[in-house]
A protein has these predicted regions:
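Non-catalytic substrate-recognition and accessory regions of acyl/acetyltransferase enzymes
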Residues: 1-125, 130, 137-148, 163-189
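Short beta-alpha junction loops
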Residues: 151-155
Length: 189
């Protein structure tokens, strides 16, 4: 069905443009917020370079994650047009990765996978705020009211940190789901 195929391509292109706009806006906001970032920070999609750089991270065993970034990225590219992809760079150094997607009914944009880089990376402490802002900008663009972090790692410090960033509600659509939600705030300007 060629028409459906072309229509899907048009939708895919729309989301591609949206992802790029979100990355550009988030980068711009963080550069304004932290002048030291200008000329150093770069937000991109999860490129081959990003996957290769992530492979080289020296992550201690207790911070290992249970997924393969290449597999996750390829699966999301295949199955989810309305996805968010983020690689956070400081110069040539990859500092974090995130991938997420909009729910079927576009009610929520979820951060499904997120990982910060090596312990001493120059953007330590910024990965979650940057990822969260990207999810939020994507949500605003598709008129979703919520962003969420799916299956957050069960670590008290981390969970408190997520709450401080505003992820302090349980899933309003499925109370049994292990996720932290935050209502999207749209700037009235």
């Amino acid at each position: 069905d060629r028409h459906k195929c072309m229509n899907n391509q048009a939708i895919a292109n729309k989301y591609q443009q949206l992802r790029r706009a979100v990355l550009a806006q988030a980068q711009n906001e963080f550069e304004q917020f932290e002048a030291d970032f200008i000329g150093h920070i770069d937000l991109t999609e999860i490129t081959e370079d990003a996957i290769r750089s992530q492979d080289e991270w020296d992550i201690p065993v207790n911070r290992q994650i249970g997924w393969d970034w290449r597999q996750v990225r390829d699966q999301y590219r295949r199955d989810h047009m309305a996805r968010v992809e983020l690689a956070v760079w400081h110069g040539e150094e990859l500092c974090g990765l995130m991938i997420g997607k909009a729910s079927e009914g576009k009610l929520v944009v979820k951060i499904n996978y997120i990982q910060g880089g090596e312990v001493e990376n120059p953007l330590k402490g910024y990965i979650v705020p940057i990822a969260s802002r990207c999810a939020e900008l994507f949500a605003v663009a598709i008129e979703a009211d919520w962003i969420g972090i799916q299956d957050p790692i069960d670590d008290d410090d981390l969970l408190n940190y997520y709450r401080e960033l505003g992820f302090d509600e349980s899933d309003p659509f499925d109370p049994r789901n292990n996720a932290l939600f935050k209502r999207v705030v749209v700037d009235e300007d």
